[in-house]
């Protein structure tokens, strides 16, 4: 979705839809709701079976266009409408659909409010939202209020108040609102989930998650693409801007919101140096990139304590020159798995082999590959999308809707994982003092069923 600097400055703190609040996060005490739930809990929500899932897309830029392509290769779906403020990317997605021999979708453009016309249609069941971050919450809320299920790119929300608005709307409308955390559908993450459920690591103690991905080059995207708006978040906040890719899988390993929940967080950031240095090196002195005050620390490290006493380290770094990593570490009383590169150490009777990493993963894949990957992995890899995880996520969403099954990720997961952005900023700004997590489940986490090892 083409949105430039002018748009960012106008909408980052206020929503054109009138429901976004200030970027400044509420304190955790203020975030506790003083009103009853808006409706029944949507944990484990099951909606009527859909023989055909009718889809609308809002935002088909770099991310959303990939979703359109994947949906063209899914059975049991119809692409009804596509919306984007950029006519060029809109036309490209429309043309891709028709070149696959599928009916031409309706198209909506012309203003930032054009998506509401798409939502007014009565022939759409779900809406895929892939827009700049500040639009995620209002569009998700508007989608559910229009009687449709919302599937939203990460992060789900940018303030505590937005998180509560989304939860309240999901409960009031009894609609799904899933933040599409694709990494949970990676082969390695699914395998580790299977290992955890089979008790390989014993009782879980600690996890480590991260989004370490050098993205300074996006600063050269001035008028369009992700860098044209994402760069400015480094001038607005100092915390973990993007926590969910690493945190989502670790949360599912630990049954967060399904028997345990995040209790409190403490966070600290390194100096913010890298983006300013990059701007000086890559742009003229009078360029707009050299007029910005980059305040987000190059590396942010947060520690989360769960109600059961377990710990999770979460890191964010999209600035320093280093290899990509999400850490993906889970430690239990009987052993540990760590990713990037994959390695494992398990205590075995009469052996101290756990003192050395086992990096030969072939035998572990053979024994613990997730049933879903065994059944769908080849098709997922063939269709692509971050090694197949994107396709598998979308396939699984459609499968659940067509078979009247609960989604693997619900609105409580999306808000709990996303709120780390806000709480980390609050902690950093308060000398790393701890900040309490809101309980978006309103106590339902105590009886939530753990995510099982599922197949097709």
Curated annotation (Swiss-Prot):
Enzyme Commission number(s): 3.2.1.-
Residues annotated as binding NAD(+): 62-63, 84, 133-136, 153-154, 182, 242
Membrane-spanning parts: none
GO MF, one annotated term: hydrolase activity, acting on glycosyl bonds
Cofactor binding description: Binds 1 NAD(+) per subunit. The NAD(+) cannot dissociate.
Top-level taxon: Bacteria
Keywords: Glycosidase, Hydrolase, NAD, Signal
Post-translational modification: Predicted to be exported by the Tat system. The position of the signal peptide cleavage has not been experimentally proven.
Signal peptide positions on this chain: 1-31
Residue sites binding substrate per the record: 211, 230, 242-245, 324
One protein family per Pfam: Glyco_hydro_109_C
Presence of the UniProt keyword ATP-binding in the record: no
Listed InterPro entries: Gfo/Idh/MocA-like_OxRdtase_N, Gfo/Idh/MocA_oxidrdct_glycsds, Glyco_hydro_109_C, NAD(P)-bd_dom_sf, TAT_signal
Cofactor(s) in the UniProt record: NAD(+)
Function: Glycosidase.
PANTHER family: BCDNA.GH03377, GLYCOSYL HYDROLASE FAMILY 109 PROTEIN
Family: Belongs to the Gfo/Idh/MocA family. Glycosyl hydrolase 109 subfamily.
Protein name (Swiss-Prot/TrEMBL): Glycosyl hydrolase family 109 protein
Organism of origin: Shewanella pealeana (strain ATCC 700345 / ANG-SQ1)
